[in-house]
Amino acid sequence: MGSLQAMRRAQRAQGPATIMAVGTSNPPNLYEQTSYPDFYFRVTNSDHKHALKNKFRVICEKTKVKRRYLHLTEEILKQRPKLCSYMEPSFDDRQDIVVEEIPKLAKEAAEKAIKEWGRPKSEITHLVFCSISGIDMPGADYRLATLLGLPLSVNRLMLYSQACHMGAQMLRIAKDLAENNRGARVLAVSCEITVLSFRGPDAGDFEALACQAGFGDGAAAVVVGADPLPGVERPIYEIAAAMQETVPESERAVGGHLREIGWTFHFFNQLPKLIAENIEGSLARAFKPLGISEWNDVFWVAHPGNWGIMDAIETKLGLEQGKLATARHVFSEYGNMQSATVYFVMDEVRKRSAAEGRATTGEGLEWGVLFGFGPGLTIETVVLRSVPLP
């Protein structure tokens, strides 16, 4: 009889988990930030609130977001007017939309990732899906697996309501699955649609106005696996390490509550400072085995959050100008797409590296960090190793 140790060795991959493909998608409806206040106050029947509209216009300008993609259109909102109210119970209307639309948008991103990966989708062994919205049974993971035609034997995991750090969290889980199940190929998908948080304006709720000004809709997918097949699978990054930390006594720093009116969000006005003051400890612990302590020596795949958070991180860590340029670019072109955003940044980093003739997928550097932060306050840190570019 074989030993348990031999059985366990046979189940584990030989090499580290790698990211083999990335795909992204957005709804077709593009909204320019300069004209969004007019749209928002018109569809919510709030054009008579002149002072509040001017305030919202200033908020939109300060985000430094240029444009966003959103599922909601004026036609949809006319059909479901409760969504335009500030406090009217409207959860059922919102839920009817997201349960159907989240898997559809996710499918677009997943198909792009699978196409780049280059192997049949029947070879996908695990599906990890995350979203802040669309809680249902069976969940969005089941619906996506059905839409894609994945094998009935695919191992599914659904993650709900984790918010902005969930993209990095999902990568940590995918790493463990790939390295502990030999031959596993993990399709990890994130999809965020802001239908549950869209609502009319109120003069006394700055946080709600900030959400209307900064959040966007998008989906992203990656294929993760270890021991890539030579000549078939072409890794983009190796996942060297992944960890999570919770900042003590920070529960009220940022969070959300699911109510009859949809999602309501709150955030501490010193959130940028809180993140900046705690990120270096996470970085130090993650990179200690590599002997790296100079943060300009690594490439950055960062969840942007907002402009103020990126400014605070740059200042605290002494980052060179341009270290977070890709995160800033993605934020300005798409807004904050919560868990999906960090994958848009990853996709942009590897594409820019190739376009600029860099030596590696990490802007010419070997080691990099992917990080996200969210309610808790939770910080996810992932150590990436780039691969050489031809």
From Swiss-Prot:
SUPFAM superfamilies: Thiolase-like
Alphabetical keyword list: Acyltransferase, Flavonoid biosynthesis, Transferase
Variation of activity with pH: Optimum pH is 8.0.
One GO MF term attached to the UniProt entry: curcumin synthase activity
GO biological process: flavonoid biosynthetic process; polyketide biosynthetic process
Temperature dependence: Optimum temperature is 45-55 degrees Celsius.
Entry's EC annotation: 2.3.1.217, 2.3.1.219
Catalytic activity: (E)-feruloylacetyl-CoA + (E)-feruloyl-CoA + H2O = curcumin + CO2 + 2 CoA; (E)-feruloylacetyl-CoA + (E)-4-coumaroyl-CoA + H2O = demethoxycurcumin + CO2 + 2 CoA; (4-coumaroyl)acetyl-CoA + 4-coumaroyl-CoA + H2O = bisdemethoxycurcumin + CO2 + 2 CoA
List of catalytic residues: 164
Coiled-coil residue spans: none
UniProt cross-references to InterPro entries, sorted A to Z: Chalcone/stilbene_synt_C, Chalcone/stilbene_synt_N, Polyketide_synthase_type-III, Thiolase-like
Pathways per UniProt: Secondary metabolite biosynthesis; flavonoid biosynthesis
Listed Pfam families: Chal_sti_synt_C, Chal_sti_synt_N
Family to which this protein belongs: Belongs to the thiolase-like superfamily. Chalcone/stilbene synthases family.
Function: Catalyzes the synthesis of curcumin by condensing feruloyl-CoA with a diketide-CoA in the curcuminoid biosynthesis. Also acts as a demethoxycurcumin synthase by accepting 4-coumaroyl-CoA as a starter substrate instead of feruloyl-CoA.
Subunit structure: Homodimer.
Protein name (record): Curcumin synthase 3
